[in-house]
Structures are given as C-alpha cells and as structure tokens.
Amino acid sequence: MNDEISDLINQAVSNILINSSSENKLKKLIKTHDVKIHFVPRNYRIFGGILQSMNIQFGNFLEEFMTLLIKSDGRYDILEEYSGKKSNKFQLSTSNDNRIDQFISFCQRSDSINLDEEFPKLLNEVKNDNDTNLSSISHDIDILFRNKETGVIYYLEVKYNDDHDTGKFVDINRKFIKTYAYLVREFPNTEIKPILFFFNNKKMKGNIYVPENTNIRRGKSFFDEFLKIKYEDVDSYIRNLSESPDNIKAFDDLYRKIMAMK
C-alpha cells in the first residue's frame, strides 16, 4: 500500500479524533445531555455519542478514500465534475419517477420476484424512457468513474456497512435506482453500471430491490474486480492502526477527558 493511501487513512483518523473532542463540541454535548433524564451517567452518554459520531465520520471518509484508490489504480478516470459533489443538477421524467416507485412497491409486496430478470428490465426501461415531462433535481453523487479502455461509466453508492434499519434501507435503494435514472439522461450515449458498495464484507440480509450478483459489491469483491490493491492489505492496515499504542492512548486520553468533565 503506497504512502499516499496510508497517509490519507492516518490523517482521517487524526481529524476524526480532533473534530470529535473539540471544546465547542463538548460544550454542546454537555448542554444537550444536562437536560435529559436518563439512568446512564451523563459523561458516559457523551462518550458513547462521540464514538457514534466517529463511526459516522469514518463512513463519510470512505467516499474520499475509495475515490483515491480508484484514481490511483491507473485504469480509471474520476468524473470530477460530478463525483463527490453534493448538489449536482439533474433531470428526472415523471414516468421514470413513477416507474421506480412502482418497482420498489412491487418488490415489497412480492415473495417471488426474480431480481436477476426484473432489475435489468427496469434499468433498460429507465434508460429508454422518452417522457419529456421533466423535473429538475439537485442531487449528490458518491463516486462516478470511467474505465479508460472500455468507456463504461460506473456509479458507486458507498456505504460503510450493511446494517441499516428497514426505512433507511428502502431509501438507500430508491436513491440508488433514481440516481441511475439521472445519470442515463445526463450521459445518453454511454453505458452506465450502477453499483451499491458496502465497504465491509458483512451481509446482514438479502436485498429485495437490487440483485446481489450484478449490482452489489461487498468489500473484497469490489477490490478483486476493480482494483490492483488488495482488500486484505487495507483491512490489515486499518486493524493494526486501530490497535496501535498511539491510537489506544488517544482514545484513553479522550475517555479520561470526558469522565473528568463537570
């Protein structure tokens, strides 16, 4: 693993620790928890909340991290105009909007849907839609990259872990499919492959909206298919970093700092 990648990980961990323990943040947390009635001591609640915040920040960092890995591989171009941007301007037809919502509802009702057949059919209908009744949409894109040799564009929706509750899980998949609809209108003459990517290998439950084999990649499977760097090397580096004396000391110091707060 090259120095640029390891430096990015180290800097991200350092930034997360600093952001999570700033005096301003701690004052806000004290104010929030002072007015709550709870059997768990206040400072323990604050520490638990900070750990949860760190988890969220690490998930957000993964977009930047995966972008660097893809860019440094050499075989791909990151579409900088769209990738990582939070307010891209797109258009969505009324028919595609309804078509995707109906597909989501159908998947929820059906016990026997064949996603390997129905999902590609949906994507094809979305791509070939000619409805001119359009709505303008401001929308974020996690990662968009192009294979230099084939010209295929890959849309990557990045998630840290497959552990979302039911409501959020539905929203993730709906957003994933609608983003594809935005992109095929933006790039009408280009093959676009949407991939729902989970950084961890863990599979919590089956996806009833998106086929596992063609449009979902988990941890190692994405690295093996798209990247020269090995997933095991990244996994090992982060695990070793998490258990390093310096990192453990940083968390011990944070714990003592919070427990000493009045």
Curated annotation (Swiss-Prot):
InterPro entries in UniProt: HinfI
Enzyme class of the recorded protein, top EC level: hydrolase
Domain of life: Bacteria
Catalytic activity: Endonucleolytic cleavage of DNA to give specific double-stranded fragments with terminal 5'-phosphates
Lineage: Bacteria, Pseudomonadati, Pseudomonadota, Gammaproteobacteria, Pasteurellales
Name of the protein this chain belongs to: Type II restriction enzyme HinfI
Organism: Haemophilus influenzae
Keywords assigned: Endonuclease, Hydrolase, Nuclease, Restriction system
GO biological process terms held by the UniProt record: DNA restriction-modification system
Recorded GO MF terms: type II site-specific deoxyribonuclease activity
EC numbers, comma separated: 3.1.21.4
